[in-house]
Amino acid sequence: MPRGRGRGVALLYSGWGTYLAQVAEVEVTGAGDVRVHRVVCAVDCGRIVNPDIVSAQIEGGVVYGISGALWGEVTLKNGRVEQANFHNYRVLQMNEAPPIEVHLVRNSEAPGGIGEPGTAATAPALGNAIYAATGKRLRKLPLQPGTLRHLCIDDTNRSP
């Protein structure tokens, strides 16, 4: 992989009766900005009645998971939530969404959940990809660009 890029893996074991493996590929710029280039999911959710709906649910969950992992912070001021709506609560926009591949494992087991698993695996996959790209482990969500900027600046200020 080129410098500043990395892949991260996350596994969801029997969440909502579904097994899911997710790989995220990200790029972290010298300024600490994160760009998600691609997400691949393998999903075993038991008997699949409508594969298109299963794929769409996983894709939507991944998009929501990226938004939450990168920007999903709710702050309080004087006991009230500051984020009133999407004008001040950042979510991934359509033109920012990476390609998302969903591979379905077909079997005859009982159907499991499909809405949540894509979301639940996204933050760990992104965190591991950021670590692979930078060597820096972030241990708090959201994976804030400010934290990455600080870490990237620290690295450039170090002498060899």
Segments from the language model and where they lie:
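Cofactor-binding beta-sheet edge motifs in enzyme active sites
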Residues: 1-160
